[in-house]
Amino acid sequence: MITKEDFSIDDRVEKMKKPEMGVIVTFLGVVRGEGEIKGMNVEVYEKMAVDELEKLEREAREKFEVEAVEIVHREGSLKVGENIVVILVGAKHRKEAFRACEYLIDELKERVPIWKKEV
C-alpha cells in the first residue's frame, strides 16, 4: 500500500492479529535527521510500486512459513522523525517472521520504484 497519510503501527498490528499466530514482527523506517537534513521527499511510481509490493507480499508468504504480510510505504514530503515505511509479518514462530521481514525490506529497496531525496 502506498499512502500520503501517516499510519498507526498499533492499528495495523491489531488488524493483523489471528489466533494461530504467535508473533508479529514489525520493521519501521523513519526519516533520519543528520546534520542539516530537515526531511525527505519521497516519490513513487504508484501503479508499478503497488504491483511490486503486492508481489513481494505473495512471495514472502510462499517462501517463508508466515500467516500474514503487510507493507505500507509513504510518499510526499516528510519531516525528520516521521514514518516512511512499515512492514508487518505474522507467523506461528519468530524465526520465519524475522527472515521474511528482512527479505521484504531488502527486496523493497532493490525492486520497488520509490525514490528518496533528503532536503
Task: Name each model feature, range by range.
Residues 1-83, 90-119:
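N-terminal, polar/charged subdomain of small-to-medium soluble alpha/beta proteins
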